[in-house]
């Protein structure tokens, strides 16, 4: 059975003091949970504060982006080696905001995934269609294209050990979440692509999250779907009570 993974994507929120306060409120709520892996992905400036606060806990640290370059004259960029040095185990790559606002292509995302793996980081590879693509019936084709580009050059074992996050662009930060049954259909199709390209074992092992307006009140419905293995949580992860409730729902779903 795949262990659920719930990751907090704080985006461009929280100073170091705010991050420390979040942990002070969240960690006591997390302490009794089992059967779920939890990751917090703060902005770069709060990585050190969060890393310190997570010492001795089961909660993992992740980053929200990284360069595909190992080092050099790349102003403003952060390498995989730097993330490892900061204590990161995970890194979010290919988020729709990176693709849409900063022009990251499928090829760039794939290069970042390969670079992350070279540094021992676990990529959380984000894929997802826009509203226009969904309405045109192109969702599965878009997800397939983004997925195969992001996984290009990887071995079945590497694919089995990373995380995929299906985030329909039209559901991110809009309050309009994808129907759990529809999310299951999209994610089952993604898993089928993995099976086709990398084999049934990789497809059975890889964890696939849902993301897009995830809240405490809808998390259980997503976790009831057989192919959904957790969530990549945006806005609701900024509140420790809300995020703890989402994590608890994931843990309870797998305990049944």
UniProtKB/Swiss-Prot annotation:
It is an enzyme of class 5 (isomerase). Keywords: Cytoplasm, Gluconeogenesis, Glycolysis, Isomerase. It is found in: Cytoplasm. It comes from the Bacteria. Pathway: Carbohydrate biosynthesis; gluconeogenesis; Carbohydrate degradation; glycolysis; D-glyceraldehyde 3-phosphate from glycerone phosphate: step 1/1. GO terms for biological process: gluconeogenesis; glyceraldehyde-3-phosphate biosynthetic process; glycerol catabolic process; glycolytic process. Involved in the gluconeogenesis. Catalyzes stereospecifically the conversion of dihydroxyacetone phosphate (DHAP) to D-glyceraldehyde-3-phosphate (G3P). This is Triosephosphate isomerase.
């Amino acid at each position: 059975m795949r262990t659920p993974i719930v990751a907090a994507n704080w985006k461009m929120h929280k100073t170091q003091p705010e991050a420390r306060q979040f942990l002070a409120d969240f960690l006591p709520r997390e302490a009794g949970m089992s059967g779920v892996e939890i990751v917090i992905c703060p902005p770069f400036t709060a990585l050190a504060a969060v890393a310190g606060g997570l010492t001795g806990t089961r909660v993992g640290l992740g980053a929200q982006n990284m360069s595909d370059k190992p080092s050099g004259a790349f102003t403003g960029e952060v390498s995989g080696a730097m993330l490892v040095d900061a204590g990161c185990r995970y890194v979010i790559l290919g988020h729709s905001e990176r693709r849409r606002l900063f022009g990251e292509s499928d090829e760039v995302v794939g290069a970042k995934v390969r670079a992350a793996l070279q540094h021992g980081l676990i990529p959380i590879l984000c894929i997802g269609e826009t509203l226009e693509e969904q309405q045109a019936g192109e969702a599965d084709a878009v997800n397939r294209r983004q997925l195969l580009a992001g996984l290009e050059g990887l071995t079945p074992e590497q694919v089995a050990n990373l995380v995929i996050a299906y985030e329909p662009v039209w559901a991110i930060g809009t309050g309009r979440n994808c129907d759990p049954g529809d999310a299951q259909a999209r994610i089952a199709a993604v898993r089928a692509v993995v099976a086709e390209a990398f084999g049934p074992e990789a497809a059975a092992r890889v964890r696939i999250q849902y993301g897009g307006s995830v809240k405490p009140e809808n998390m259980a419905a997503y976790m009831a779907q057989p192919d959904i293995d957790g969530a990549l949580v945006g806005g609701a992860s900024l509140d420790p009570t809300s995020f703890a409730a989402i994590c608890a729902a994931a843990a309870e779903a797998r305990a049944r």
